[in-house]
């Protein structure tokens, strides 16, 4: 265990039992006043001795003091760890870009390890000429770069019946936001020549789930990408190396990874992941299908249950993320009193279409209880609803598309908890 | 002469020089674009909007056709185009009845889904659940929720059994589908499903779905100016996550403390504790020295086995038995696993898993143990077999 304050990660139970290091900062400050801060007055080994040579880590990794910053899973959610999910540690990140190694994983048949030399992309069905591309072929098409969020339709799905998981990593961590480099899907379809009756596409993965989803041609020709790079480097294995589909603003399940085939057809296929799964069962026993767009949503990442307020009263930075599958986020409101009074947060960083946005709200914490919420407005005028507003329309059995307003209750010790409020 | 031209001056291919020169020029031209007021328009108000303008500028690339790729051959399309639609498009000729389906199901599916589709552990329940879709806990099965039979056929055919996808014959898929219909009370025990009668079968919940109507129903309601001040009188907590207390805790997620049976605990192994586990294994391996490089190699090969077999700390039976201690043990001897009768008999005859027997089995599982439940077709190379055997040995000492 390191003595560095940042590296000290008391467990959630410790926080909840009140044994948090809440006073640690104050303690260090007091000590410094008395005898001088040893971090300054004593010669540190890293100041005296030489550091690592250049090639110690040919592929660089985060500092050893950041080892707590990692994806985490919730074992009881799925039957096994292969067709499973883990979550992005949103509370440890800032800015708008998710580092590649922290992008949450969702596989249906495990993360396939594919030799790019053996990978092919086929386009068949209602096209003039069915085609096969090698990775080398794909690299010769014009490329574009775009930052998009990818959110699993089931993000926050465990919260329909009420507060369940204590941490924004678990309640909201099925999302990431990266810059993709890819080929407009339109160009590949044009290369094969879509016949006039071709109204849908069926992308298919090369993994052991052979994932398939039906996507309307209008979207395919609009902004979909066949991407091979994320944040400048090759896609990670778990994100579909060597090539994946990017379906901006639409639910993550449609972004088929390890993409090996695109079929053009005249009707949707109604495959497993668009009938049995990824359909939204409503209170009347009927289900919505083809709920592709991700509604506008936001969450405060700090403070949050995994990131309590440890500095005591005084100047405090509240921050979080907001996004919409229908456009940009021109405005985010936050409240510290459970929605009696709202304040406009400050958005900092690029405001890009169908990308995550970073917001901040700085305030003086008086040490009293806080009821924190954020509310996203998107460029279409849509305002993020409360969880109860959503339940009025959908009941509690939807699983998917829960974009309700999240509440964190922060007590006098700075400990935060996932709650719902009146 | 420019530096780039000097570089290419020695080239025998004049065309290449011209082409490269052109690309080089184009490249420079692109880097100059931001200075071009005509392209960028008026000076942007802030760096953020400049970013937007640059990022959303599209349609700049050539539209083709580029003449890239090659025509797909009919046999290639046939190999990959396996999808089935509700109208029967894509369905291959074939047939299978409930009786045969039960046999295949018990062999291939029951380990996860239960003999009657009731679901083992958290694996999907396939049967029943009728009239539960408005309940507190709806049971969504192929019978109660799935709209189309084609979805069942397509999914079983493309992704099942879990860990050995696309290994079932078309007739087996017809048979399993018929058995699922029978278990859901939708057909009699003497029913046979084929490409001929497929479209006659409808599932009860076919009309239980409709197109996304959020745009008409919800968006108007959620598109309005929200209250900013004095929005409510008071605030009470109505529900708290701490009551349920189901959040994974860092403190209890380490390998040391998950010593008790955590079942499928591969997540814990990912949690950085994997190195500890490996170290332990290396320490224990004092008896016949293991070739650690080969063990590492074998760990990679074992990925092919992982969907059905677990090995290491906390390993438990899945589709296949857990493999701790397998080397040196009789065939079919792991406790509480339902082996094929052949496998058990061979064990009773005293046949033991050695490098030789394992090699024979892994090369052609079904010919070494006739009737084995392991549907894996076998490993192609002797190197892979040697590596995975060495890997298994590391858990058998």
Per-range role (PLM):
Chain A
Residues 1-14, 21, 28-29:
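N-terminal secretory signal peptides
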Residues 24-25, 194:
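A generic secondary-structure boundary signal that marks alpha-helix termini
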Residues 31-33:
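Sec/Tat signal peptide C-region and signal peptidase I cleavage site
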Residues 17-18, 77:
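Intrinsically disordered, low-complexity segments enriched in polar/charged small residues
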Residues 35-422:
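Structured, non-membrane catalytic/scaffold regions adjacent to prosthetic-group chemistry
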Residues 19-20, 251:
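Enrichment for repetitive, rod-forming helical segments
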Residues 1-2, 7, 25, 46, ...:
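Intrinsically disordered/low-complexity terminal segments and short unstructured peptides
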């Amino acid at each position: 265990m390191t003595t560095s304050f940042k590296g000290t990660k008391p467990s959630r139970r410790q926080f909840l039992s009140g044994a948090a290091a809440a006073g640690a900062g104050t303690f260090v400050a007091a000590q410094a006043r008395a005898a001088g801060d040893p971090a300054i007055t004593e010669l540190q080994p890293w100041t005296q001795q030489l550091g690592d040579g250049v090639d110690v880590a040919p592929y660089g990794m985060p500092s050893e003091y950041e080892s707590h910053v990692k994806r985490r899973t919730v074992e009881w959610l799925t039957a096994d760890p292969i067709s499973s999910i883990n979550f992005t540690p949103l509370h440890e990140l800032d800015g708008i870009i998710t580092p590649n190694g922290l992008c949450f994983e969702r596989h249906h048949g495990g993360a396939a390890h594919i030799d790019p030399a053996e990978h092919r992309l086929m386009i068949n069905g209602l096209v003039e000429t069915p085609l096969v591309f090698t990775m080398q072929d794909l690299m010769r098409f014009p490329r574009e770069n775009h930052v998009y969020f990818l959110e699993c339709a089931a993000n926050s799905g465990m919260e329909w019946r009420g507060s369940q998981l204590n941490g924004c990593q678990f309640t909201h961590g099925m999302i990431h936001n990266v810059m993709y480099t890819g080929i407009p899907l339109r160009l590949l379809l044009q290369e094969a020549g879509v016949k006039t009756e071709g109204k849908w596409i069926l992308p298919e993965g090369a993994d052991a789930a052979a994932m398939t989803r039906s996507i309307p041609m209008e979207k395919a020709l609009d902004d979909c990408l066949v991407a091979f790079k994320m944040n400048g480097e090759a896609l990670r294995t778990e994100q579909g190396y060597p090539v994946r589909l990017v379906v901006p603003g639409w639910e993550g399940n449609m972004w088929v990874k390890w993409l090996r085939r695109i079929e053009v057809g005249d009707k949707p296929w109604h495959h497993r992941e668009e009938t049995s799964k990824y359909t939204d069962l409503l209170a009347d026993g009927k289900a919505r299908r083809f709920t592709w767009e991700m509604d506008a949503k936001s969450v405060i990442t700090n403070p949050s249950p995994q990131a309590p307020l440890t500095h005591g009263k005084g100047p405090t930075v509240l921050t979080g993320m907001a996004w919409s599958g229908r456009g940009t986020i021109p405005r985010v409101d936050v409240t510290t009193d459970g929605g009696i009074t709202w304040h406009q947060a400050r958005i900092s960083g690029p405001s890009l279409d169908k990308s995550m946005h970073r917001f901040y709200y700085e305030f003086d914490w008086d040490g009293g209880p806080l009821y924190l919420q954020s509310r996203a407005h998107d460029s279409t005028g849509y305002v993020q609803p409360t969880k109860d507003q959503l339940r009025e329309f959908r009941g509690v059995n939807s699983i998917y598309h829960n974009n309700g307003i999240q509440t964190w209750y922060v007590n006098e010790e700075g400990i935060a908890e996932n709650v719902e409020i009146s | 002469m420019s530096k780039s031209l000097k570089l290419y001056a020695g080239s025998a291919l004049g065309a290449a020089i011209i082409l490269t020169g052109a690309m080089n020029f184009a490249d420079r031209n692109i880097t100059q674009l931001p200075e071009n007021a005509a392209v960028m328009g008026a000076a942007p108000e802030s760096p953020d909007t400049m970013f937007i303008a640059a990022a959303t500028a599209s349609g700049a690339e050539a539209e083709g056709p580029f003449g890239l790729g090659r025509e797909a051959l009919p046999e290639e399309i046939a190999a990959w185009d396996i999808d089935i639609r509700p109208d029967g498009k894509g369905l291959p000729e074939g047939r299978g009845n409930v009786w045969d389906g039960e046999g295949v199901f018990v062999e291939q599916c029951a380990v996860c889904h239960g003999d009657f589709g009731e679901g083992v552990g958290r694996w999907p329940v396939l049967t029943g659940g009728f009239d539960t879709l408005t309940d507190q806990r709806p049971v969504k099965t192929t019978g109660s929720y799935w709209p189309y039979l084609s979805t069942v056929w397509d999914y079983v055919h493309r992704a099942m059994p879990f860990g050995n996808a696309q290994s079932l014959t078309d007739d087996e898929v017809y048979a399993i589908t018929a058995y699922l219909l029978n278990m859901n009370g939708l057909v009699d025990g003497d029913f046979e499903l084929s490409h001929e009668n497929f479209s006659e079968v409808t599932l009860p919940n076919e009309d239980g779905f409709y197109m996304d109507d959020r745009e008409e129903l919800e968006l108007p309601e959620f598109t309005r100016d929200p209250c900013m001040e004095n929005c409510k009188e008071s605030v009470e907590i109505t529900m708290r996550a701490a009551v349920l207390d189901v959040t994974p805790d860092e403190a209890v997620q380490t390998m040391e403390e998950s010593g008790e049976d955590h079942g499928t605990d591969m997540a814990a192994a990912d949690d950085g504790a994997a190195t500890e586990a490996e170290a332990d294994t290396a320490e224990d391996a004092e008896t016949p020295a293991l070739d650690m490089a080969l063990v590492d190699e074998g760990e990679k090969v074992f990925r092919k086995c992982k969907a059905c077999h677990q090995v290491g700390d906390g390993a438990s039976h899945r589709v296949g038995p857990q493999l701790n201690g397998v080397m040196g043990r009789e065939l079919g001897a792991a406790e509480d696993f339902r082996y094929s009768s052949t496998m058990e008999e061979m064990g009773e005859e005293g046949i033991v898993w050695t490098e030789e027997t394992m090699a024979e089995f892994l090369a052609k599982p079904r010919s070494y143990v006739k009737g084995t439940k392991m549907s894996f077709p076998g490993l192609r190379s002797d190197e892979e077999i040697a590596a995975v055997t060495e890997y298994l040995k590391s858990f058998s000492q």
